Curated annotation (Swiss-Prot):
Acyltransferase keyword on record: yes
Name the record gives this protein: Isopenicillin-N N-acyltransferase
Reaction(s) catalysed (UniProt annotation): isopenicillin N + phenylacetyl-CoA + H2O = penicillin G + L-2-aminoadipate + CoA + H(+)
Subunit structure: The active form of the enzyme results from processing of the 40-kDa monomeric precursor to a heterodimer containing subunits of 11 and 29 kDa.
Length: 357
């Protein structure tokens, strides 16, 4: 997996990302265009109008992130609107038209810390678009995350020990002035605690479309289950655990209807809770949970199967909060294509300390 270290001003960070991942970003854009056109059935002119509005909102409300997007576009030699599209793809594909995708996420508190993880399931073709980013910024924790090339926030953790996961939800609707999901993920990744991440996202005044974000460290974890008109907070159960898949667990507004989630979302949720009941608390056992193939191919470890399952688990990430490290398995955990561990050095730890001051 391509690994890019980005540092400096927001524009410089974006430029390094864009120039190093130029070819991969081109593939990400091609995929996003096909996905959005297929999901929304809207004309190019209608999509252009929505994209223009979302771009203006990002520029006005989060100029730092817009500068990074502008830097990516410059480095990748693409139009800024194309990078805006990548970073608002959820709002297009899920806000304008209910879509169906799967992921499984879990957090488990232990006597000496916590373990947190996710299987990220999506269309198999996007695996080649995944990259690994390390971003160093003055006054903020260093962040390390796995993302699709061109997208500024996704699944990862920071040198303050805050880890972030992301699941699709199926509440239709789009509020163009709300926070795009990938901007919210970046806000969480730049926070010094789960509580701060939750507060900072809520303070933005609402989300643009529906999704679920889990934020955890060694001491606490929260889930943000949101739609364009509501944000609900998921907390740990009596056993210090939290599990989420791709259906709503919390009550939203009476006019907000969940539209046809994947039936296996309930199966995966129940299966993960069942597996955690027998979990012995070791990292090795936690890692094995993500390779579970019960109800194959619609299992926690999802598999592509022609005519049945259109997606697959493209990567698994496990955060060991006691060790302050994350293990990534690219591909299905049963037979990964690549495995690596992400850690922070002393310089990164100092950045986290300074961010707390």
């Amino acid at each position: 997996m391509l690994h890019i270290l980005c540092q400096g001003t927001p524009f410089e960070i974006g430029y390094e990302h864009g120039s190093a991942a130029k070819a991969v970003i081109a593939r990400s854009i091609d995929f996003a265009v096909d996905l959005i056109r297929g999901k929304t059935k809207k004309t190019d002119e209608e999509l252009k109008q929505v994209l223009s509005q979302l771009g203006r909102v990002i520029e006005e409300r989060w100029p730092k992130y817009y500068e990074e997007i502008r830097g990516i576009a410059k480095g990748a030699e693409r139009d800024v609107s194309e990078i805006v599209m990548l970073n608002t793809r959820t709002e297009f594909a899920y806000g304008l038209k209910a879509a169906r995708d799967g992921c499984t996420t879990a957090y488990c508190q232990l006597p000496n810390g916590a373990l947190q993880g996710q299987n990220w399931d999506f269309f198999s073709a996007t695996k080649e678009n995944l990259i690994r980013l390390t971003i160093r910024q003055a006054g903020l924790p260093t962040i390390k995350f796995i993302t699709e090339a061109g997208i500024i926030g996704k699944v990862g953790f920071n040198s303050a020990g805050v880890a972030v996961n992301y699941n699709a939800l199926h509440l239709q609707g789009l509020r163009p002035t709300g926070v795009p999901s990938h901007i919210a993920l970046r806000i969480a990744l730049e926070s010094t605690s789960p509580s701060q991440a939750y507060d900072r996202i809520v303070e933005q005044g609402g989300m643009a479309a529906s999704a679920f974000i889990m934020v955890g460290n060694g001491h606490e974890a929260f889930g943000l289950e949101f739609s364009p008109t509501s944000i609900r907070k998921q907390v740990l159960d009596a056993n210090g655990r939290m599990v989420h898949t791709n259906h709503c667990l919390l009550q939203h507004g009476k006019n907000e209807k969940e539209l046809d989630p994947l039936p296996d979302s309930w199966n995966r949720h129940q299966r993960m809770e069942f597996l955690l009941d027998g979990f012995d608390g070791t990292k090795q056992a936690f890692a094995q949970l993500w390779a579970d193939e019960d109800n194959y191919p619609f299992s926690i470890c999802r598999a592509y199967e022609e005519g049945k399952s259109r997606g697959a688990t493209l990567f698994n990430i496990i955060y060991d909060h006691a060790r302050r490290e994350a293990t990534v398995r690219l591909g299905r955990p049963t037979n990964p294509d690549e495995m690596f561990v992400m850690r922070f050095d002393e310089e990164d730890e100092r950045s986290a300390l300074n961010a707390r001051l």
